[in-house]
UniProtKB/Swiss-Prot annotation:
Keywords attached to this entry: Cell membrane, Hydrolase, Membrane, Protease, Transmembrane, Transmembrane helix
Reactions performed catalytically: Cleavage of hydrophobic, N-terminal signal or leader sequences from secreted and periplasmic proteins
Ranges of the Cytoplasmic topological domain: 1-33
Transmembrane spans: 34-50
Entry annotated with the keyword Membrane: yes
Annotated GO biological process: signal peptide processing
Similarity section: Belongs to the peptidase S26 family.
Pfam families cross-referenced by the UniProt entry: Peptidase_S26 (PF10502)
Protein name: Signal peptidase I
InterPro entries linked to this entry: LexA/Signal_pep-like_sf, Pept_S26A_signal_pept_1, Pept_S26A_signal_pept_1_CS, Pept_S26A_signal_pept_1_Lys-AS, Pept_S26A_signal_pept_1_Ser-AS, Peptidase_S26
Keyword Cell membrane: yes
């Protein structure tokens, strides 16, 4: 009689492979992903929220000087129309393009006339519906005569603060609301002039 047990010998179950770990990206790939995400976020902010702009000319003296850097916000005009005194950045109008077909740079001017208002420039003053506009921010009183004209619906009359050296609405007409990019809110350069841009004028 055999001394060994007749019961079957237990079998060791085969080893199960360990769960595979996701392969870590190389430092180069991580860097590319980070840069890509940063670019997407920057483009989104620039398109929908705000962007930086610089001043290329003297047309907004003394408020804005050549090479000033500004932040232009793009959100508020989706909810409220521009106000008198806002400093806006806008795409060239059709009238501007007709005068200069190669023109594609954005303009920056101050909103003076609102839709439905009658505007006149006479005697060195701007009149809104016959009432003089108080303007303590202009370089010098305008030396030209213009109007009276009624501002069309959904359009704005804009003038440079340097009234006698500004290519603005008194040359080429009104800015449709759809052309407006946004409102200049803060000057961030040069640092000695950093701050919010001034309140709107009154009359």
């Amino acid at each position: 009689m055999s001394s060994e047990s007749d019961s079957p010998t237990p079998q060791t179950p085969p080893a199960q492979p360990a769960a595979s770990q996701p392969k870590a990206d190389s430092p180069l790939m991580e860097g590319i992903k980070t840069i890509g995400l940063s670019v997407v976020l920057a483009l989104g902010i620039r398109t929908f929220v705000a962007e930086a702009r610089y001043i290329p000319s003297e047309s907004m003296l003394p408020t804005l000087e050549v090479n000033d850097r500004l932040i232009v916000e793009k959100i508020s005009y989706h909810f409220n129309p521009p106000r008198r005194g806002d400093i806006i950045v806008f795409h060239p109008t059709e009238a501007l393009k007709q005068q200069n077909p190669s023109l594609n740079e954005a303009f920056i001017k101050r909103v003076i006339g609102l839709p439905g208002e009658t505007v006149q420039v006479t005697g060195g003053r701007v009149l809104i519906n016959g009432q003089p506009l108080e303007e303590n921010y202009i370089q010098s009183p305008p030396d030209y005569q213009w109007g009276p004209e009624k501002v069309p619906a959904d359009s704005f009359l804009v003038l440079g603060d340097n009234r006698n050296n500004s290519y603005d609405s008194h040359f080429w007409g009104y800015v449709p609301r759809q052309n407006i990019i946004g409102r200049a809110v803060v000057r961030f350069w040069p640092v000695n002039r950093l701050g919010e841009l001034g309140p709107p004028p009154s009359y």
